[in-house]
Regions:
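Short acidic/glycine-rich loops and adjacent helix/strand connectors
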Residues: 1-157
Length: 157
């Protein structure tokens, strides 16, 4: 199964294709660090506009020679994140899913970080405790199993 993943929660436009048999088969990332550097932090409106300008190019770059019809599902970051930035990724995902007649999978940004180690093929034994630090969100999580976890504490950034 090939999943196209779209990430636009903050200041990076990223698209990847993951094949459940072969692993990562395509990816492209555009960072907005230079755009926001002079402001000392991410400006949400600038981030949204830049996602809008870059997302089609990033999609084509990630796709490479892969036929879009071979994509089985489209996942996108549904939150948390900057609202405008999230909407760019979500709308792109919806348009692509409609054009290709593929199902959509909304993904919680933080849950994506939580399960990312499983994609590398590493074996993790349940249960485990993890510290998840991502931008303005930090969590301590008791992971009992896939889709079975409890947030023990979190920051108030």
């Amino acid at each position: 199964m090939i999943t196209l993943g779209i990430e636009t929660s903050c200041d990076e436009t990223a698209i990847a294709l993951y094949d459940s048999k072969n692993g990562l088969i395509g990816e492209a990332v555009f960072s907005q660090i230079e755009l926001h550097r002079d402001y000392g932090g991410v400006i949400p409106e600038l981030a949204s506009r830049d996602h809008c300008q870059k997302i089609t190019h990033i999609f084509k770059e990630a796709l490479g020679d892969i036929n879009p019809n071979s994509i089985d599902q489209i996942a996108y970051t549904a939150g948390p994140g900057l609202l405008g930035a999230l909407l760019i990724g979500e709308n792109f995902a919806h348009g692509l899913a409609l054009a290709l007649s593929k199902p959509l999978v909304p993904v919680n940004h933080l849950e994506g970080h939580l399960i990312a180690p499983f994609l590398s093929g590493d074996k993790l034994d349940f249960p485990f405790l993890t510290l998840l630090v991502s931008g303005g969100h930090s969590l301590i999580i008791d992971v009992k199993d896939l889709n079975d976890y409890e947030i023990l504490g979190q920051s108030r950034d």
